[in-house]
Amino acid sequence: MGISTVTDQNWHIVRYSAEEKERWDRFVRRSKNGTFLMQRDYMDYHADRFQDCSLMIFCNRKLTALLPGNLSGNCFYSHQGLTYGGMLLSPSITLQQVESVFHAALDYLQKECSVQSIVYRAIPHIYHRYPAEEDLYVLTRLGATLVARSISSVIPLDDRLPFRTLRRRQLKKALASSLT
């Protein structure tokens, strides 16, 4: 296992290491808000560009949350090699546990990694398996400052968008010009 710290009698944090890959990936697949971006094969594609500082957070020896991240100087990013990279949560986690997870992670990052600031990019809720915005609530309660907001859009595959007349005209022009 990686560097480990006991934050209190219930919470235990382990810094990710390669021997934890299978456990990490299994948790991502069953978490309420993980996506393929958080699978280690995807994250490790840029391993040479970022100093990984991903955290595995345990409650009573049970993996409860993951925090993909990297260090740059004294700043923790969730994660610069990913489009987004917020806290991945167990489907059974409670709001009180999420608060404890954040407090434990902040304590760990300050004490073990000398982190002075955090840049947190939440996982857009449209990608969640189960609604999960506890992280945003807790960050607000902790006094976090919003510095940027990104937009995420989806197209429901089972509800096709109408084909507009203007698009049809442009398509005919493209075909007539041998542009395909």
List the model feature ranges, each with a label:
Residues 34-41:
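Short Pro/Gly-enriched beta-strand edge/turn motifs at strand-loop
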Residues 113-124:
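Conserved GNAT acetyl-CoA-binding A-motif
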Residues 1-21, 132-180:
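Acyltransferase donor/substrate-recognition loop-hinge adjacent to the catalytic core
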Residues 24, 120, 174:
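A residue-level signal for conserved active-site and pocket-lining positions in enzyme catalytic cores
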